């Protein structure tokens, strides 16, 4: 981000005075802190049914070897449920979270999504990059800060 900031500053210093620059993104971010990082490795491994954990630190996509084990996986995660909402993907599809979902897309979706609450971040240390533990801002859940799309205007 520091490099991007420096490049943008340099670019804006060189544009004509009657020119505007508009910058946007596809999502917002939320600031987090190390004490609010939850490493869920033991919970994910307990059932033996978790094949892979993907997504982001604010929304974990949990893929299972056996979709019949979903309730057990949710139960294994219960000690940390204060920090996330566990949403079965079939329920999210039924609630139209994704719009129309065709079978090729369904085949790629996880069985379970964990949506972080407040400023918690959720990790499985095997699947998340080490550098993500040092980041101070994250995205992926449904907080107002994360679903708001930023827009910056420079000039005019």
Q: What is the predicted function of each stretch?
A:
Residues 1-156:
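Feature captures the catalytic ectodomains and active-site-proximal regions of enzymes
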């Amino acid at each position: 981000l520091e490099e991007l900031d420096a490049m943008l500053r340099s670019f804006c210093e060189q544009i004509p005075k009657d020119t505007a620059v508009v910058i946007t993104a596809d999502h917002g971010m939320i600031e987090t802190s190390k004490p609010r990082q939850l490493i869920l490795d033991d919970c994910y491994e307990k059932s033996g049914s978790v094949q892979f954990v993907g997504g982001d630190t604010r929304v974990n996509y949990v893929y299972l070897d056996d979709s019949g084990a979903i309730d057990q996986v949710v139960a294994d995660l219960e000690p940390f449920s204060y920090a996330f909402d566990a949403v079965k993907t079939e329920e999210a599809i039924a609630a139209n979270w994704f719009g129309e979902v065709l079978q090729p897309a369904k085949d790629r979706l996880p069985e379970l999504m964990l949506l972080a609450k407040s400023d918690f971040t959720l990790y499985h240390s095997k699947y998340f990059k080490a550098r993500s533990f040092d980041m101070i801002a994250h995205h992926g859940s449904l907080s107002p800060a994360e679903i708001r799309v930023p827009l910056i205007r420079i000039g005019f």
